[in-house]
A protein has these predicted regions:
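Internal alpha-helical scaffold of NAD(P)-dependent oxidoreductase catalytic cores
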Residues: 8-10, 92-96, 163
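A conserved short coil-to-beta-strand element within the FAD-binding core of flavoproteins
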Residues: 110-126
Length: 222
């Protein structure tokens, strides 16, 4: 489902969501061979209906030639595969999405909190809202509700007595922003000695290096 959703987003927002290549180097001692990861990448490509460019199996010589930044002295090879990314950033994408909705007679409001929803006998949704500036509460009726609360999706479902099969798991990490490391528009991927994955993501004239691998119970930061 995630791959199909990604493909739909790539087709619907070609100027905002684009395909990008992930370039993965593997060192000696890694728990899997490059061939195993290559077949996993082929499976991922197939699950996505072969919508993106095909994965590649890389030799240390190829990696050294195509990305000389990578130290291949201990390399056993690697893989390259495709996924998607937001060309600008998530904030701009959301703003443009809301702006487009407003042009089609949508009503967008700030500082209004959903206190939960319930269905009436006709199947309509009644949602209780609170104006967090005046503390006034009111109710609206709708045919459909789309829960787009991001990390607070589960919390909103609880308020509305909605049960789902899947739930969010939260994680945090650290990201370092440094001057651009590589000229190619691809994400460099590395595995630490303990198996953690690190990304070096191109962002304009900068590269963002990091990982999010520490599980937390809530989305709020300290």
């Amino acid at each position: 489902k995630l791959c199909k959703s990604r493909n739909q987003l790539l087709s619907s927002y070609p100027s905002s969501i684009k395909e990008i290549r992930f370039y993965t180097n593997l060192d000696k001692g890694f728990r899997h061979s490059s061939s195993v990861l290559y077949f996993a990448a082929l499976l991922y490509w197939g699950i996505g209906n072969f919508f993106t460019r095909a994965p590649r199996l890389l030799s240390p010589l190829q990696i050294n030639k195509e990305e000389s930044l990578i130290n291949t002295s201990n390399s056993i090879g690697g893989i390259e595969y495709s996924d998607a990314y937001l060309y600008d950033n998530d904030a701009r994408f959301v703003f443009n999405f809301i702006d487009s909705a407003l042009e089609n007679n949508c009503k967008a409001v700030n500082y209004v909190e959903s206190l939960g929803s319930k269905q009436d006998k006709k199947g309509d949704w009644l949602t209780k809202l609170r104006n967090n500036r005046s503390n006034d509460e009111f109710e609206i009726r709708s045919k459909i509700i789309i829960n787009a609360c991001g990390p607070y999706v589960d919390q909103q479902n609880q308020l509305s007595n909605q049960k789902t099969e899947h739930h969010h798991v939260f994680s945090k990490g650290i990201h370092l922003v440094v001057p651009r490391l590589n000229k190619n528009e691809r994400v460099l991927t590395f595995f630490a000695d303990d198996g953690r994955m690190f990304f070096a993501i191109p962002m304009g004239g900068r590269t963002m290096i990091g990982t999010t691998d520490t599980h937390v119970s809530t989305p709020e930061t300290e």
